[in-house]
Amino acid sequence: MARHLVIGSGASGVHYALTILERGEEVTLLDVGYERPAAPLPDATYTQLKEQLADPLSDILGERSEYVVYPGPVSKPYGFPPSKSYVFRQPAAWSLTSRGFDPLVSFARGGLAEAWTGGSYELDERDLAAFPFSLGELQPHYATVARRIGIAAERDDLERFSPMTAGYDAPLPLDAHSAQLLGAYARKRQRVNALGVYLGRSRVAVLTKPLGERAECTQLGRCLMGCPRESLYAPSYTLRQLHRFPGFAYVPGVFVERILLDGDGRATGVMTRELAAGAEKRFTGDRVVLAAGALASSRIYLSTLQHENGAAPELPGLMDNRHVMMPFVTPSRVGHDVEIASYQFHHLALGMRGNSAGDDVHGQITALKGAQVHPIVSSLPFDFRTSLSVFGRVRAALGIANFWLADTRRAANVAELRVTDDARHQLVLSYGDDRSDLGRTNQAIAAIRKSLRIIGAIAPKSQTAVLPRGSSVHYAGTLPMTNDERKHTCRADGSVRGFERLIVADGAAFSSLPAKNITFTLMANAVRIAHASQ
């Protein structure tokens, strides 16, 4: 029997496990665990990769051209390449339906952060106002995670929104487009700040110097496909590190169905189903730690109550950041060369301070280098040949600002369980008040569009898209931490009320959802909870 039975190998699970192992205790980690494929030609740039692969069309676009992004009402300029298909592969045992919510889930080794873009921002006291612990209780664990994963950052105007208390590495070199925008901001800061908008360098979990087995970024331009040098952090790298501890056991290929409870409500283990054989298999532990991601952990919790009581409750308070995508063009860069061999994701970030933490806005600005051509070309008002020619001229001038609004727990947004006709447990997600923040959203759109114009970029109104709920991939709030003694909530240490030795270490336990990207905080909070789990 393991001392700690951890479910899930994503950002929360691996950092909880590493903290426990470092103090000499045993951990068994259960996982579906789909694996990342090996990266071909790991030293080649993206351009060299296209030239040297035997079949670049299939290897890069996929055997069925699944990497091609086709035009649609809201077409993102980035798709997920075949090398990332393992991240979104789902076992047959998983079932989900939703209303007003279009989520992504992952059963990969490393979870959804295997496909993240590395944004890593510390929360401030405003962000934690709804949480039952203080910023001072979280900050030491940011330092631990930063030391483990490596984060490139620079002190700038964004420190008013996100502290820099952890140890950070030197920032990545800027691409020319991002450098031009940041330089324009430095000259016109007062005008931009008057709109409530502040710009700075994006803080990214990318190495600018070697760390353990991982190498520093050398600007190969292969970030979208998966960094072959492991410069861009992924939780699967920490999972690999866990295997060095004698007290660690990793069990992939199992789907956790429910938590096992004794007559006193004490968690004693879990019931799983083996993916290969389909047989049920029990695992026991002194405590059970839900770290499968907010949605999967919610399904396990609800399935447990369905089995124990014959019915499962609704879990109100499902949260997801409002996500806005704002393409722009910087006219002075038309005709310039495109820097394909560079870091492909965001180099810049932005912040807006609202009247309360729930009104704050956080964003990241990307100069498009590795974007998909098809959705952009198809939107131009010319024939295809002319559109391609125009795109070639303006490509170096294109960029995109993605920004997010904070979210709060509200009763209309729920997770619940449905037992299907074939006795499967299906997670049902409903986001019932999608219009609650449209006023704040429109204010942010107007301010950010004006700010971009001040620094020389034009963001056409017709191209700005308010994306469907679920697009942010920041899900939280179904089993919130609170000081209130209520059912289906957690204490500050992640322990679930009404049960013993059951812990939630992922976003399901978040009390509110700040605008900032939460992966860094998920890891730091998991470390905090692990320290509290004695």
Residue ranges of predicted features:
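Glycine-rich loop(s) and the adjacent beta-strand/alpha-helix scaffold that form part
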Residues: 22, 26-52, 245, 254, ...
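Residue-level detector of alpha-helix initiation sites
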Residues: 10-11, 295, 509
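Short, glycine/acidic-rich hinge or "gate" loops at secondary-structure transitions
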Residues: 38-40, 153-166, 458-466
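Conserved redox-cofactor binding core of oxidoreductases
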Residues: 53, 57-84, 95-98, 102, ...
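FAD cofactor-binding and catalytic pocket of flavoenzymes
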Residues: 80-105, 110-112, 131, 135, ...
